[in-house]
Swiss-Prot record:
Coiled coil: none annotated. The gene is yoeA. Residues 51-130 form the TBDR plug domain. Pfam families: Plug. InterPro entries: Plug_dom, Plug_dom_sf, TonB-dep_rcpt-like. This is Protein YoeA.
Length: 130
């Protein structure tokens, strides 16, 4: 079934469609800019991401240049130089265990070492577990 649409309504609807496309493109561009500006991810023991400058704790940053210049075989080897970080090899298929100030993350080799730190589960050792 064909409808007879007046030319004025067609032009206005086409114009509004074009304007909405421009606005959505501008919104997408600004969100991409936000993502590219936030390159530093802070990994804490409570598994949440936060801004580096808003954190109340002492933070060590290993930047991309340091990782590129490093001769270490893994990220775990780079983390060994940070105070409060202890790396142990539990010899289960080459997995490493990382303790950050007494907190142990049993799945850290799968998540942090594969650059997915938000899924790592951490727990605090009690005196009887050491």
């Amino acid at each position: 079934m064909l409808y007879n649409i007046p030319c004025r309504i067609y032009i206005l609807s086409t114009l509004s469609l074009c304007i909405s496309g421009i606005v959505s493109t501008a919104t997408a561009t600004s969100s991409e800019t936000k993502i590219s500006n936030e390159e530093t991810l802070v990994v804490t023991t409570n598994r949440s991401a936060s801004n580096l400058w808003e954190s109340p704790a002492t933070i060590q940053v290993i930047d991309q240049q340091t990782l590129q210049n490093s001769t270490n075989a893994s990220i775990a080897d780079n983390l060994q130089d940070i105070p409060g970080v202890e790396i142990t090899d539990n010899s289960l298929a080459g997995r490493k265990q990382i303790r950050i100030r007494g907190w142990i993350c049993p799945y850290i080799s799968r998540h942090l070492l594969s650059l997915n730190p938000l899924q790592a589960r951490c727990r605090r050792y009690s005196r009887g577990e050491r």
